[in-house]
Regions:
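Short glycine/proline-enriched loop/turn "hinge" motifs that connect secondary-structure elements
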Residues: 20-25, 58-59, 153
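A short beta-strand-turn-helix
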Residues: 11-29
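Short clusters of hydrophobic/aromatic residues that line enzyme substrate/ligand-binding pockets
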Residues: 21, 110, 167
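C-terminal cap of thioredoxin/glutaredoxin-like
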Residues: 5, 9-13, 32-35, 43-56, ...
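A structure-centric signal for secondary-structure junctions around beta-strands
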Residues: 25-27, 63, 83, 156-157
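Structural alpha/beta surface segment adjacent to cysteine/selenocysteine redox centers
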Residues: 31-120
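Flexible, active-site-adjacent loop/turn segments at secondary-structure boundaries
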Residues: 18-19, 102, 165
Length: 185
């Protein structure tokens, strides 16, 4: 999906500071830079969810760790930054992954009113969510993800790193699963 090959390795290693599914000590650690308004990011994320489920069933929960990092491309996706802020504000209430899924599922509707509706649907404290949404600390967190992506050569989304090495293959289940399994050996 993304042919930028200027860097082949992840220069900001995974850490407990990231949004993590799984354990950092897993055999395979995937880091995806994504944009909530980008259909390719949504498709890539959904593909990774399917692969993670299949590999966890086959090899156990500790086999694969998935990390999502924000990379809103505001020049082409005007609502991507605010959607990322909504995800981080939801994270402040322990609901990052549910909001992440919701934003990707509804990426055509990311205006402010919808973001509040999604937060309400997830049972978030709406006054707190609205207060947290514009907080500079959340914006700084997103900017850190973007800066790390840029350092690692990311210019477009989605961008995927498998065990810190840039994945440049096809975003199809067979190819991606083969690359993940190969990285575990």
């Amino acid at each position: 999906m993304n042919d930028d090959r200027s860097h082949s390795s992840l220069l900001v290693p995974p850490s407990s500071h990231d949004w993590i599914q799984g354990v950092l000590g897993a055999k395979v650690v995937l880091v995806m830079y994504g944009d909530y308004q980008d259909s390719k990011s949504a498709n890539g994320y959904k593909l990774i969810k399917v692969i993670k489920q299949e590999l966890s069933a086959s090899f156990g929960e500790d086999y694969l760790c998935f990390i999502f990092r924000h990379f809103p491309q505001t020049q082409v996706h005007p609502h991507a930054q605010r959607a990322a802020q909504a995800a981080v504000a939801a994270a402040a209430q322990g609901q990052f992954w549910l909001m992440n899924d919701t934003l990707f599922d509804h990426q055509q509707n990311l205006e402010n009113g919808y973001l509040v509706e999604y937060a309400n649907d997830l049972g978030l404290d709406i006054p707190k969510f609205l207060k947290d949404l514009p907080k500079q600390v959340h914006i700084d967190r997103i900017n850190q993800d973007v800066a790390g992506g840029i350092q690692s050569g990311v210019t477009a989304t989605p961008a995927l790193f498998i065990n810190n090495i840039r994945y440049i293959g096809c975003w199809r289940i067979t190819e991606l699963m083969a690359a993940i399994v190969a990285a575990s050996h």
